[in-house]
Amino acid sequence: MKITYRKSAIGYSRDQKATIRSLGLRRLNSVVIHDDTPTIRGMVFKVRHLVSVEEIADDTSPDAETGADLERDGGNRS
C-alpha cells in the first residue's frame, strides 16, 4: 500500500504524531510503501485524516519505491 502524508500533524495528539513517524513519513507529501498488514492498517486508521492511501500491485516490493535509492544517487533515476 502506498501512503502519502497529506495534512500536518500540528495540533494533534502526540500519539498521532508518533504514528506518522512510525509509518516513515517525515514531511508533507512524502510517500512510503508498506506491505498490507493488520499492523500497518491499524496505524493508517489512526491517522486516516492526515494521510491518503492507495492500493498497489502485489508484485511491487516495499523497497522498490521508498525513495532510499533516490537519496543515494541524488534524485537521478536511470
UniProtKB/Swiss-Prot annotation:
Biased composition (Basic and acidic residues): 69-78
GO molecular function, one term: structural constituent of ribosome
SUPFAM superfamilies reported in the protein's UniProt record: Ribosomal protein L30p/L7e (SSF55129)
Gene Ontology terms: biological process: translation
Keywords tagged on the record: Ribonucleoprotein, Ribosomal protein
Recorded GO CC terms: cytosolic large ribosomal subunit
Signal peptide interval: none
Record's keyword annotation contains Ribonucleoprotein: yes
Source organism, top-level taxon: Bacteria
UniProt cross-references to InterPro entries, sorted A to Z: Ribo_uL30_ferredoxin-like_sf, Ribosomal_uL30_bac-type, Ribosomal_uL30_CS, Ribosomal_uL30_ferredoxin-like
UniProt biased composition (Acidic residues): 58-68
Keyword Lipid metabolism included in the entry's annotation: no
NCBIfam families the UniProt entry points to: rpmD_bact (TIGR01308)
Subunit: Part of the 50S ribosomal subunit.
Xref: PANTHER family: LARGE RIBOSOMAL SUBUNIT PROTEIN UL30M, MITOCHONDRIAL RIBOSOMAL PROTEIN L30
HAMAP family (alphabetical): Ribosomal_uL30_B (MF_01371_B)
Family: Belongs to the universal ribosomal protein uL30 family.
Name of protein: Large ribosomal subunit protein uL30
Organism annotation: Roseiflexus sp. (strain RS-1)
